[in-house]
Amino acid sequence: MRYALLIHYPQPAVSTLTEHQIEEGKAAFHAYARALDDAGVLGSAEVLQTIASATSVSVKQGKLQVQDGPFADTREAFAGIFMLDVADLDAALAWAEKCPAAQWGTVEIRPSAVRFVDGAWTSTS
């Protein structure tokens, strides 16, 4: 079963982090992604740039509306996603617990409903 691990955490100003903290974070995520890959459960992984680089788009009454910043103004920001292919929710929970972001934010687990592969939508359940 495919699960998305959605990473949410407060985004500190990069200037408040030491070089050592940044390197520790990169190393932790590298080790985590490597463990997922070595276990054969990693579909893909993306860590997003900060919310300062976000742009939100909507179409209201046929008119394009573009806004700087994220869609929602929340304390925690959506910061990344890991797509896993594991046996069940318990396996996804075990991997979410090991995610470095779980130590300073939240890892939301959501099962995939459908995916687009080879030109067609396919059920993932």
Where are the language model's segments positioned?
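Conserved, structured core segments of small domains
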Residues: 1-125
